[in-house]
Amino acid sequence: GNVAELTEVR
């Protein structure tokens, strides 16, 4: 769990 991954809108 990265912050970048969490904030990416998919």
From Swiss-Prot:
User: What lineage, starting at the top, does this entry show?
Assistant: Bacteria, Bacillati, Bacillota, Bacilli, Lactobacillales
Keywords linked to the UniProt accession: Antibiotic, Antimicrobial, Bacteriocin
User: How is the activity of this protein governed by pH, according to its UniProt record?
Assistant: Active from pH 1 to 10.
- Taxonomic source organism: Lacticaseibacillus paracasei (Lactobacillus paracasei)
- Reply yes or no: does the keyword Glycosyltransferase apply: no
Protein name, entry field:
Bacteriocin BacGR
Task: Please describe what this protein does.
Answer: Has antimicrobial activity against L.paracasei BGKP20.
The free-text temperature note is: Thermostable.
Q: Name one GO biological process term.
A: killing of cells of another organism
